């Protein structure tokens, strides 16, 4: 039985996720799907100019996995450019450091980097905030924070 695929850490999401060749009729356009983690691998290596080890570390994967991801990404982009195909950025197996929180007092829903302090609502300043998403990437962190808060509350009683 193969090992489960590990989530790849992604820090960047493009504003535009679809690119098409100029002047080609819609009925003739075929597309290549570039996964979100493939775009992230190219961004880290080619734009941020990090070495392979640094890229793999940032994405929380092995160097070999990083190499496989970037090879796949570059091949897809090369095919799209040489054969006049559209590039659609979508899907993949990734996670992010963003977590959606909700303020219990004012109802404000906002996103933060879950590794930073999350205890104050940016709208009203309340400390009564809860995780609004319960996604896999933040479940452990939110659960750990809730346990810590419950422990501190029981200590103060």
UniProtKB/Swiss-Prot annotation:
Pfam families: DUF134 (PF02001). InterPro entries: RNA_pol_sigma_r3/r4-like (IPR013324), UPF0251 (IPR002852). Transmembrane segments: none annotated. Belongs to the UPF0251 family. This is UPF0251 protein CLJ_B1488.
């Amino acid at each position: 039985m193969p090992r489960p695929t590990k989530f790849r850490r992604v820090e960047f999401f493009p504003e535009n996720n679809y690119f098409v060749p100029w002047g080609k009729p819609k009925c003739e356009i075929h597309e290549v799907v570039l996964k979100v983690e493939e775009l992230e691998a190219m961004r880290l290596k080619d734009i941020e100019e990090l070495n392979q080890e640094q890229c793999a570390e940032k994405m929380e994967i092995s160097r070999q996995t990083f190499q496989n991801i970037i090879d796949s990404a570059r091949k897809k982009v090369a095919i799209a450019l040489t054969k006049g195909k559209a590039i659609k950025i979508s899907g993949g197996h990734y996670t992010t450091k963003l977590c959606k929180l909700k303020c219990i007092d004012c109802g404000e829903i906002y996103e933060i980097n879950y590794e930073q302090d999350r205890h104050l609502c940016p709208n009203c300043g309340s400390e009564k905030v809860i995780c609004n998403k319960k996604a896999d990437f933040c479940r452990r962190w939110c659960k750990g924070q809730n346990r810590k808060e419950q422990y501190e509350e029981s200590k103060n009683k």
